[in-house]
Amino acid sequence: MEGVEGGPRGAGPPPARRGGARKVAWVLVDGLGDVGSPELGGRTPLQAAASPGLDALAAAGLSGLLDPVAPGIACGSDTAHLSLLGYEPRGLYRGRGAFESLGAGLRVDAGDIAFKCNFATLCEASGKITARRADRHFEAEGPVLCGALDDLRLPGFPDCRVRVRYATEHRCGVVVSGPGLSDQISGTDPLRDGLPLQVPRALDPADAAAEHTARVVAALSEQMTSVLKRHPINVERARQGKQLANVVLLRGCGGRLEVTPFRERHGLRACMVAPTKIIAGVGITLGIDVLDCPGATGDYRTNLTAKARAISAALAPGAPGDYDLGFLHVKAVDDAGHDGNLALKVNLLRAVGEMVRQLARLLWRHQQETGIEYVLCCTGDHSTPAAFGDHSHEPVPFTVAHLADVVRALGGEEALGCVSLEAVQMPPVDAPAAAAEAGGGRVPGAPVAGDAVGAFDEIAAAEGALGRFLGAGVVPLLKSFVLRP
C-alpha cells in the first residue's frame, strides 16, 4: 500500500494545499471504546446508545477501526493525541507533566520539570493513599489550595522555584525550576488506592542530575503535605466528614517537547476546544490554538453545545485564524469509564451524538451561506471500558464524511433545521441508561461517498472501507478529504 505507514486502506499521499479547500471539524471522544456488557445484552455502550447523530455520521461516510498508537497498546490520552495529530510518541514522549502544566497556564522553559498532579487523600498513620482523587468537584477549593502551594520554598534547595496552577476537577499542574534538574525520575503516585505514597527515585542511579532531582521532588512532596494538612479547607473538610485533600501526587515528570509546529508539519491551520488541561497542553506544544469556550468544563457538567458553537464559529469563513481544522475534545465519556458507570457512559454518548447533530446544523448554515464545504470526523483516543475502570487496548471506531452527505443521512435540510440548538442536557450521574430511540437511529443504505456501515460502534466499524489502521494515518486521511477535487 502506498501512502502513510499504518494508514487506512486506499489513503495515498494527499495533494499539495490549494485555495478554497474544505474545512474539517474533528470530534474526539476521550475513552470512546468499550467492550460488550451483560448489563447491555452483550452490546457495547456505543451500540446501546444507538445515537441518531453518530449513526448518521457513520452512514454518510467512511468507517474503520483505529489503533491510536499501535495494536495491543493501552495508551494514555497524551500519547494517543500526539499520535493522532501526526507525532510519533515513542520517539518524543518525556512524560505528561509538561502537557498538564502548559494547559493549566504555567510556563515551562528548557531545563524545567513539570508534573501532572492529583489532590489525593493520605492516611498519615499508615502512609497509604486511601483515595487518589480527593474529590471530582473541586472547582472552588482546588484554586485556593493551589494558591497556598504556589511559590513554595524548599528547605535545602534555595535555588529551586515551585509554581502550582489548578487544572480541572482534582488535578493541578506543578513546575519546578532550578539548576541541574532532570526529568528522568519516578513520581510519588502509587497509581492505585491502598498503596503507600511513593518516594521519587532516579530511573538510573548513576545519573547524578536525576539523583539530585529525586531529592528535590521528595522535599517538595513533604512540604506540600505539611501545608495542606494544616490548611483551613482541610480542617473544614474533616469537620464535614469529607475526604481530605492533604497530599499532592506528583506524576508524569517531564520537560517541554520541542517539535515542528502542526501547521508547518501538515499545512493546516488548526484550533481546538479542550478544557481538559493535558489535551490543551498537547495542543500548545504542537502550536495549535486553544480556544476559550465558556461553559466547557471537561467534566460531567460541561456544555457540549458551547463546544459545538465555538468550533463552528472558528471554522466560519472569514473568522480570525482562518482555520482549516477544528478539534473538539469531549472528556466526560472517559470519566464515566474510569468511574465504572456503564449507564452514564451510554447516556453521555447519546449527549455527544446530539452535539454532533448541532454541529452539523451550525456548519451547514456556513456552507449554505458561503459555499465553503465541510468535513466531519469522529473517533476516540483509546478505550476505557466501564467494566475495567481504566484504559484498555481495544481499537476505537473512526468515521469521516462530507457534511452534505451527513445532512442527507440526518433526513435532509428540513429535518436538520428541527435540531434544537438549546444546550444539550447532560445526564444525571446516577440515571439508568435510557432506552434507545425508535429505530435506533440507524440509516438504511448510505450516500454515494460512504460505505455499507450504518452505525457508529466498535462492531459496525470493523466492516468499514477504511479497515483497521494506526493513529498516524488520521491527519493524512483528513487532508485527502480536504484537498481532493
Regions found by a protein language model. Give the residues of each.
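Feature captures the catalytic ectodomains and active-site-proximal regions of enzymes
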Residues: 2-485
